[in-house]
Amino acid sequence: MSASAVITGSGLYTPKEAISNEELVTSFNAWVDLFNTEHSEDIAKGEIEAKTHSSAEFIEKASGIKSRYVINKAGILDPHRMVPEIPERSNEEPSVMCEIACQAAGASARRVRYWR
């Protein structure tokens, strides 16, 4: 008799932090102001175009998204970064994606009562 694998459930990982369109736009518009100030001479010469502000309404209309779950909200909303700040890990440590997968798998297994 041969053994076979069966998928009996699925898991989901949802980050604890969320960013609303309003929060994202506030941060993005601050970045736009920083960019335009930093590049004001090139913008005045016509070498590059000035960035323009966005709005929460535009994001919702264009994407249908009102809020998104994120890892490291502070890093994403920092107009000097605009990306998550996730420390580099050694090759001996599990990756962020591995941790996410393990949490999702654990949630799935608990639902089907393999783990308690």
What are these regions (language model features)?
Residues M1-R116:
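Conserved "HGTGT" condensation-loop signature of ketosynthase/thiolase-family condensing enzymes
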